[in-house]
Amino acid sequence: MYAMQGLDVVERVELHTPFGAPSDRYVVGALAGQLVAFLPRHGIGHRLTPTEVPSRANIHGFKQLGVRYLISVSAVGSLREDYAPGNIVIPDQIFDRTKGIRPASFFGNGLVAHVAFDRPFDQQLADRLYEAAREAGATAHRGGTYVCMEGPQFSTLAESEENRRRGHD
């Protein structure tokens, strides 16, 4: 997914951030009359493993470009039988199993902050995404808990069963 249908590319931007280099160059262009920026999280050619993705640099780069809303698309598995392959799920919660494995904050080195994260996703944006998916004819599910785990492997059957018992989707 390195070309977005309907995107008129204006420029490709290489940025440097306080957190290192982003995954690749940003593609900036117009989509349905809106200025958008796109970045392949794993780099062109899918060359970065999930652990190697420089998430903080990627996010900071979007901030440098003036991006106000960030939408991340992932190909994932489901813990629910009623979620079929190709369905779109717009979660409202996240269960992060990567803590301690990769940097989890923009703070540190003398910069201390405590950030509320009880509602990690913007609900108005999520509502707009849900409506857009439905209008496009997609089967979309609103709400649910996304389990973020360290890849590149997927969960074992035992891990999946535990996540299902916890009510994750």
Language model regions located:
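Active-site rim beta-loop-alpha module in soluble metabolic enzymes
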Residues: 120-165
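Residues that cap or flank secondary-structure elements
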Residues: 17, 50, 121, 151-152, ...
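Short active-site oxyanion
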Residues: 66-69, 165-169
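Metabolite-binding pocket within alpha/beta catalytic cores that recognizes anionic/polar moieties
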Residues: 1-117
